């Protein structure tokens, strides 16, 4: 039986980028719903003893959709950390600045010692800022609901994937590293229809040590 993951930060720990109210609904309602649905769907089936990754790789239909959403959200919520820099700003400055440069949302302190991931990102995109710009553009350009992923293949090569609905890299034999949720429930309470502003702000709370660990596994 699957259970709702605990968040590695306080309910208001990601403010002003993600409000406590959004987190309450996104984690406590939406994700809990997927967990409850999956447990009901797999009861008494071959999937009951499988891991989320195995279910995603082998299932279809409603089971895939709910398992995929749990896997997506688990990786999404655990990739963030409170940012002292962002917390020092007011909600209006953080949420409603349409002209902010996404590069300023990257914690440059985490660049002091280049990891294999950062080296690879710079090798493929030229600069981290260029990667961030393309990643946000892919998220903005994804029609409807879904996820944008930084993913790696077996050789460690990186790519940005656009996945509708509950789909994700695991279902395609790729390794999921970093994701931004572009389902409206992830941002509408805080940003309304300004998806780009939401995605740009997320760089301020990404915990790159988590992403690097996923890449180096």
Mark where each language-model region is.
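Feature for soluble, non-membrane regions of globular proteins
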Residues: 1-84, 111-217
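Intrinsic disorder/low-complexity segments
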Residues: 83-116
């Amino acid at each position: 039986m699957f259970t709702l993951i605990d968040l590695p930060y306080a309910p208001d720990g990601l403010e002003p980028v993600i409000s406590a109210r959004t987190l309450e609904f996104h984690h406590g309602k939406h994700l809990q719903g997927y967990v409850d649905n999956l447990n009901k769907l797999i009861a008494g089936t071959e999937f009951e003893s499988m891991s989320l990754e195995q279910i995603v790789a082998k299932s279809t239909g409603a089971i895939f959709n709910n398992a995929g959403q749990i896997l997506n959200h688990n990786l999404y919520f655990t990739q963030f950390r409170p940012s002292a820099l962002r917390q020092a700003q007011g909600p209006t400055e953080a949420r409603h600045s349409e002209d902010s440069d996404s590069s300023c949302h990257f914690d440059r302190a985490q660049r002091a010692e280049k990891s294999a991931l950062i080296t690879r990102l710079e090798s493929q995109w030229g600069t981290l800022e260029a990667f961030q710009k393309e990643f946000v553009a892919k998220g903005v350009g994804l029609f409807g609901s879904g996820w944008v992923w930084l993913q790696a293949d077996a050789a460690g090569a990186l790519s940005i994937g656009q996945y509708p609905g509950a789909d994700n890299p695991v279902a395609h034999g790729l390794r999921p590293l970093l994701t931004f949720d572009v389902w409206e429930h992830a941002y509408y309470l805080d940003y309304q229809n300004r998806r780009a502003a939401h995605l740009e702000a997320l760089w301020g709370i990404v915990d790159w040590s988590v992403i690097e660990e996923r890449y180096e596994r």
